[in-house]
Regions:
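Residues within the DNA-recognition helix of helix-turn-helix
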Residues: 49
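N-terminal helix-turn-helix DNA-binding core of bacterial DNA-binding proteins
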Residues: 7-45, 67, 73-75
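Alpha-helical DNA-recognition elements
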Residues: 52
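Glycine-centered, phosphate/nucleic-acid-interacting loop/turn motifs that mediate DNA/RNA or nucleotide
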Residues: 57
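Amphipathic alpha-helical dimerization/coiled-coil segments
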Residues: 1-5, 22, 81-100
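Basic, amphipathic "hinge/linker" alpha-helix immediately C-terminal to the N-terminal HTH DNA-binding motif
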Residues: 66-87
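Short beta-strand "wing" residues that participate in macromolecule-binding interfaces
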Residues: 61
């Protein structure tokens, strides 16, 4: 029998990355400060994990100005949404296998 843990996405195994992608899949996009407040994390911690998700092309960055102030928003890419769904499916399989 195949080990269902092998199907878990290594990038999304970190709880903060999973939280970030969850917010971005559930919403069209989200800005840095809102993510920081929602997830109750520091700027540095959030920035580090956002960069990891960007490297994997799971999220995209949208830079703009709002009232002449810079605004950075993040959006889940199709690749990120697919990885998130696969990760959730794998977690479901892990749970189902443990019930046997």
């Amino acid at each position: 029998m195949k080990n269902p843990f092998e199907n878990l996405d290594k990038v999304l195994e970190h709880s903060l990355r999973l939280q970030i992608i969850s917010v971005l899949v559930a919403n069209d996009s989200c800005d840095f400060n809102t993510l920081k407040e929602l997830l109750n994390v520091t700027d540095g911690n959030l920035a580090t994990h956002i960069k990891a998700l960007e490297r994997e092309k799971y999220i995209s960055v949208i830079k703009s100005f709002v009232d002449r102030k810079p605004n950075t928003r993040y959006k889940a890419t199709e690749r990120g949404k697919h990885a998130f769904k696969k990760h959730l499916d794998a977690m479901e399989q892990v749970i189902k296998q443990q019930k046997r």
